[in-house]
Amino acid sequence: VLTGDFSLENGYQLTRDLIAETRAGAGFCFNAVFTSNDMMAIGAVRALKDHGIAVPDEVEVIGFDDIEISRLVEPPLSTISQPGLEMGARSADLLLRMIEGKKPRPKTLVMKPGLVLRGTTRKLTEEER
C-alpha cells in the first residue's frame, strides 16, 4: 500500500517508483493497481505505458470515482462508481433538518458502489482462474 495525494502526477510518480523497485529486484511483482481515485489511476496507466507495460494485458488498473474523463482516456478506465445523487440527496436532507433545528438522528447509511468494467481490466482466462 502506497500513500498518495489523489493527483494524476502522484499516481504517475508512485507507479513509476513501483516499476523501478520491481525491476531492481525488490522481491515482488505486481499485476494490478487499485487507486484511491480516477485521477491517480490515469496517472498510473500513463506511467505503465511510458515504461512499455501493456494495460491491461500485463498490469490491470482500476480507479475510484467514475469521473467523466475516465471514459475518455485510452484505454477507458475501469473504476468504482459512487451513488453521487443519493449521497447528495441524503446530505441535503440532513442539512435541512439541522437548519430547521432538528437534531440529526444517529444512523449508519450504506450506499452501494458499482463496478464499472472498461478497458484497463480484462476477463481472466480459464488457465488464470
Model-derived features with residue positions:
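Hinge/beta->alpha junction and helix N-cap segments in small-molecule ligand-binding domains
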Residues: V1-R16, F34-I42, F64-D66, S81-R90, ...
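Venus flytrap/periplasmic-binding-protein-like
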Residues: F6, D38, V45-T79, E126
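Short, well-structured alpha-helical segments in soluble
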Residues: Y12-F28
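Ser/Thr-centric signal marking residues that sit
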Residues: T15, S78-T79, T120-T121
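Short, well-ordered alpha-helices that flank and scaffold nucleotide-derived cofactor binding pockets
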Residues: R16, A20, R46-D50, D93, ...
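Short, high-confidence coil segments that cap the C-terminus of an alpha-helix
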Residues: G27-F30, P104
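Hinge/cleft segment of the Venus flytrap/periplasmic-binding protein
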Residues: P83-R129
